[in-house]
């Protein structure tokens, strides 16, 4: 059975666990509509991505 040769220090253990924390999602303000959206994602309200219409928008009644 594999056994660690040395005890893991608290610093090394903490550095390993630092990647486990949940990260806050980032949002950017859309230049055209002013809505908040995720970076590199299309704007669902307008259907635009990088200045092009990529999604047909449903009309709200």
Curated annotation (Swiss-Prot):
Basic residues biased stretches: 1-16
Extent of Basic and acidic residues compositional bias: 17-44
Chain spans, region Disordered: 1-61
Disulfide bonds: none
Keyword Ribonucleoprotein part of the UniProt annotation: yes
Any one GO BP annotation for this protein: translation
Record key words, sorted: Ribonucleoprotein, Ribosomal protein
Any one GO cellular component localisation term in the record: large ribosomal subunit
Molecular function terms, GO-annotated: structural constituent of ribosome
Keyword Ribonucleoprotein carried by entry: yes
Family per similarity comment: Belongs to the bacterial ribosomal protein bL32 family.
Matching NCBIfam families: rpmF_bact
Protein name: Large ribosomal subunit protein bL32
């Amino acid at each position: 059975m594999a056994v660690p040769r040395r005890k893991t220090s608290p610093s090394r253990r903490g550095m390993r666990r630092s990647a486990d924390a949940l990260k806050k999602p980032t949002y950017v303000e859309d230049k055209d509509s002013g809505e908040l959206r995720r970076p590199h994602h299309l704007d669902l309200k307008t259907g635009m991505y990088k200045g092009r219409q990529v999604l047909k928008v449903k009309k709200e009644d």
